[in-house]
Swiss-Prot record:
Organism field: Escherichia coli O139:H28 (strain E24377A / ETEC)
Pathway listed: Amine and polyamine degradation; ethanolamine degradation
Cofactor info, note text: Binds between the large and small subunits.
Enzyme Commission no: 4.3.1.7
Chain positions recorded as adenosylcob(III)alamin binding sites: 207, 228, 258
Family: Belongs to the EutC family.
Biological process (GO), any one: ethanolamine catabolic process
Single GO MF descriptor: cobalamin binding
Gene it is expressed from: eutC
Name this polypeptide is given: Ethanolamine ammonia-lyase small subunit
InterPro entries: EutC, EutC_C
Assigned keywords, A-Z: Bacterial microcompartment, Cobalamin, Cobalt, Lyase
NCBIfam families linked: PRK05465.1
Organismal lineage: Bacteria, Pseudomonadati, Pseudomonadota, Gammaproteobacteria, Enterobacterales
Cell compartment(s), UniProt: Bacterial microcompartment
Length: 295
């Protein structure tokens, strides 16, 4: 369908509504008759930069200040504009870039050097590689035999609180937030007078693996910090799953208390650490977690 046919349909529809059809659009556009767009699309722009995220694609807005304020208030995909019924090129490219970034953080590995630099004991689940981790979640819920022996030999037994870190589905969530959440979390637990276990890193772990860990070490409360499944453009979100007196055979998902969306754009890691300390204290007082806790 060419432009003439489109204009004919518009005139027909407008006439049926009793309104005057707009004049046909000119084939050419000069600087004196066409206003410049508010923003321009650029292939040179880094699609992961703050500038790209703040980009406003609505051309010739009636209230540009409203769009600017809306764009600043959320990380959602607003004010991207349209090219007819389709998204603008810049918006589409950023969508694809964010999708690629999310896939990358799922497939990346936490470097062994990073784990050693943090002074963490590293163990793993029954999973041996990332592909198996994504296709066999059941194996990510159990420690391998070597890990069980390592925990028995190198970790504090019968702690009040055991903190575990796992890569989960987001490597970035661990490496980006670690420095701001683990030190204040450990310090807060110790200041509360609690016996804190040896923190360690579980490679290829799923949430339920904390049940086996708690059972092996005799922990009253197990706190698992694990990378969340990334969303578009948000690959650094961390979750905390806390459970009281976990047992592999009897603990169910309703027994866990979850604090999610821990990152700089959500609940700041330092603030989350304080919330987790308070949560652990209440769990020990009430001897419960999940739906069994009272407010």
């Amino acid at each position: 369908m060419d432009q003439k046919q489109i204009e004919e349909i518009v005139r027909s529809v407008m006439a049926s509504m009793g309104q005057t059809a707009p004049a046909p659009s000119e084939a050419k556009c000069t600087t004196t008759t066409c206003a410049a767009p508010v923003t321009s699309e650029s292939c040179a722009l880094d699609l992961g930069s703050a500038e790209a995220k703040a980009w406003i694609g609505v051309e010739n807005p009636h209230r540009a200040d409203v769009l600017t304020e809306l764009r600043r208030s959320t990380v959602a995909r607003v004010c991207t504009g349209r090219a007819g019924p389709r998204p603008r090129t810049q918006a589409l490219l950023r969508f694809l870039a964010d999708h690629s970034r999310s896939k990358d953080t799922v497939l990346k590995e936490v470097p062994e050097e990073w784990v050693k630099a943090q002074g963490l004991l590293e163990v793993r689940s029954e999973i041996s590689d990332k592909n198996l981790y994504l296709t066999r979640p059941d194996m990510g819920r159990r420690l391998c035999a070597e890990a069980v022996e390592a925990l028995k030999a190198q970790c504090v037994a019968n702690p009040d609180v055991q903190v575990v870190i796992s890569d989960g589905l987001s490597t970035d969530a661990i490496t980006v937030n670690y420095e701001e959440i683990l030190p204040p979390l450990m310090a807060g637990l110790k200041q509360a007078g609690l016996k804190v276990g040896t923190p360690f890193f579980v490679r290829y772990g799923r949430v339920k693996i904390e049940d086996q860990i708690g059972e092996i070490l005799g922990a009253k409360v197990v706190i698992l910090l694990v990378g969340e499944r990334p969303g578009l453009g948000q690959s650094e979100s961390l979750s905390c799953y806390a459970v009281y007196s976990p047992r592999m055979a009897t603990t169910v998902e309703a027994d866990r208390t979850c604090i999610s969306n821990i990152h700089q754009g959500g609940t700041p890691p330092v603030e989350a650490a304080a919330v987790i300390v308070d949560l652990a204290k209440r769990m020990l007082e009430q001897k419960a977690s999940g739906i069994n806790m009272t407010r």
